[in-house]
């Protein structure tokens, strides 16, 4: 079987793609890790997954990791301690992404799937220009597009899994509060159920990219599972777990970058014009999850 090399395979996005590739069974996944001795790497090895060591700051290690791969799923992490807060603008993330593109080009990768985000500075016409973890990915995307490497772009929203992975719900005596910085009750959020939908979208692109009629190469695909106001989400969770869940709007997160991100999402919206579910991905066979399905599968077992 052809090989797809997956970066971030021990994180939220890469693991979603890895699991979907394994379930699909048409490609052999190769996971990339900075350490083969980490618990996450050992868990993948125990499952029979090939895990190779590479560092996004080391182009030669990236070339070795990609050697013989038909495809790659690429993602970078602004919050990586090697990137931030050493540099508040996280320019190292751009270096990492460009290194990955260069390595993919050198190794003749036939299909590069990049996990990106819209450029906040450009789409807000300069109103929000400090959301570096968003803009950096868009800058890398531009570099990929100019590189000549055959590619497609996957765009994600707010991770629905943040509800439990980042502790968005706070326990109270009677239930939970759902505090969100910068968001008002009427503001809409666009969210991605990463573990359910991102991998499915990646596999759909991977399975169809060689067919010109599908229009995949060079295209962008927002992977938006659901849209909601936070009071709507809180109400749905409350009904499912039979406990009080109250949304509260916070004036700040304590970090300018995060405040600008949430205000940008709330006031302008990364995906205001993207229908849910994305018809381009539905046409490729992606079956998106719904907010209700996400709550039943991921929230109820943890909070009921």
For each of these PLM feature ranges, what is it?
Residues 1-2, 304:
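Universal eukaryotic N-terminal targeting presequences
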Residues 213-216, 241, 249-304:
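A hydrophobic C-terminal alpha-helical subdomain
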Residues 2-42, 57-60, 64-67, 74-95, ...:
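Oxidoreductase cofactor-interface core, primarily capturing Rossmann-like NAD(P)-dependent enzymes
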């Amino acid at each position: 079987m052809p090989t797809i090399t997956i970066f971030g395979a021990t994180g939220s996005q890469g693991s979603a793609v890895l699991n979907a590739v394994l379930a699909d069974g048409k490609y052999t996944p190769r996971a990339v890790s900075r350490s083969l001795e980490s618990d996450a790497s050992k868990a993948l090895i125990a499952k029979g997954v090939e895990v190779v060591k590479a560092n996004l700051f080391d182009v030669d290690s990236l070339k070795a990791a990609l050697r013989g791969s038909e495809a790659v799923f690429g993602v970078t992490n602004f919050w990586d301690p090697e990137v931030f807060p050493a540099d508040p603008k996280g320019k190292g993330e751009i270096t990492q992404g460009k290194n990955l593109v260069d390595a993919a080009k050198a190794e003749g990768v036939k299909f590069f799937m990049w996990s990106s985000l819209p450029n906040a500075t450009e789409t807000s016409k300069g109103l929000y220009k400090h959301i570096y973890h968003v803009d950096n990915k868009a800058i890398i995307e531009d570099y990929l597009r100019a590189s000549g490497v055959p590619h497609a772009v996957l765009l994600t929203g707010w991770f629905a899994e943040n509800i439990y992975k980042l502790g968005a719900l706070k326990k109270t005596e009677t239930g939970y509060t759902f505090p969100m910085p910068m968001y008002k009750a009427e503001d809409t959020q666009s969210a991605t159920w990463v573990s359910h939908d991102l991998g499915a979208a990646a596999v759909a692109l991977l399975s169809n990219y060689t067919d010109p009629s599908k229009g995949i190469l060079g295209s962008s695909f927002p992977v938006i599972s659901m849209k909601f106001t936070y009071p709507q989400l809180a109400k749905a969770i409350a009904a499912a777990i039979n406990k009080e869940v109250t949304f509260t709007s916070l004036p700040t997160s304590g970090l300018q970058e995060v405040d600008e991100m949430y205000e940008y999402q709330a006031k302008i919206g990364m995906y205001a014009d993207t229908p849910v579910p994305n018809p381009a991905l539905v046409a490729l066979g992606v079956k998106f999850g719904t907010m209700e399905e996400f709550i039943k599968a991921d929230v109820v077992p943890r909070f009921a």
